[in-house]
């Protein structure tokens, strides 16, 4: 879905999540994929975290009056193909970003919301008209970072009670189908036979985690979701529709990574409920 959306030449891709959830890293990864000699890319950032070859990067300086909105206004006049805005923080930046997406640019940016569906009311709060929102936003990625297990871990299996408890938070059938489809578990596997892992305390007393990895939910803006936005639907209605169209929630993506031995159920639950 993400690669498909990146190959659109206009519209907007949003990454959402709290501070420190890796949104900027995701934006830089997208820029890296798109950064070919024939494409003109410009960014407005606060701060510039990485210098990227061939990309025209502008640092926001509010103390001299250079805000995201000012930077974006200047960039669009240079007619780049792709614009990255570090964050949409206010109504003016939202309006300019939407306008850039409407006038033949691919716009990448971030928002502070807890879920992919939450990006819709956030933009509406910033006075973006629903018809403009549905004509520009192509994709929303919500994300969090979870700690990764180190090599010191032990395998275990869920009890029936554990599976029932998990079923209150995720769609068990859909998540299991994704595990089978990606060949993490063989076809015909039941939840009782899906391996999970927990950290073993190492001899030096370290906790068994090292590094972090993203867990994601990726919501494409389908025609059904467009209709819901135009009708003023709630975040939960939009989320429900996206899930019915096959979106794995962040929690489901986290459980998917648990079954791969990358992280633990406890870690995913802790991060998602924060």
Residue ranges and their predicted role:
Residues 1-274:
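Short, flexible helix-loop junctions that flank or precede catalytic/ligand sites
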